Amino acid sequence: MLKPLGDRVVLKVEEEKEQTVGGFVLAGASKERTQVATVVAVGDGARTLTGELVAPSVAAGDKVIIENGVGIEVKDDDNTVTIVREADILAILA
């Protein structure tokens, strides 16, 4: 399991469905601009200029929304995960 450093977050991005309910295949231009992901692991947080630790706003298990193409994909055992900075997370799904 990966342990992210600083303000980085490890996410498991949900697979996008390639077909609609009617069975039509979506063209590349019609894909969503955002993705839903589950937080797998969270770093300790960011440090301010004075050295104070700012705790992360997300926790393992949270479902979040990120933009497509953000972060770095990494292979962790048999899973592919994405590492992003906390600032790249747009929202937490309630």
Swiss-Prot record:
Compartment list: Cytoplasm
BP GO annotations: chaperone cofactor-dependent protein refolding
Gene Ontology molecular function, alphabetical: ATP binding; metal ion binding; protein folding chaperone; protein-folding chaperone binding; unfolded protein binding
Keywords: Chaperone, Cytoplasm
GO terms for cellular component: cytoplasm
Coiled coil location: none
This protein's record includes keyword Signal: no
Predominant location: cytoplasm
Function text: Together with the chaperonin GroEL, plays an essential role in assisting protein folding. The GroEL-GroES system forms a nano-cage that allows encapsulation of the non-native substrate proteins and provides a physical environment optimized to promote and accelerate protein folding. GroES binds to the apical surface of the GroEL ring, thereby capping the opening of the GroEL channel.
HAMAP family: CH10 (MF_00580)
Self-association and partners: Heptamer of 7 subunits arranged in a ring. Interacts with the chaperonin GroEL.
Family membership: Belongs to the GroES chaperonin family.
PANTHER family with a match to the protein in the record: 10 KDA HEAT SHOCK PROTEIN, CO-CHAPERONIN GROES
Protein name: Co-chaperonin GroES
Recorded name of the encoding gene: groES
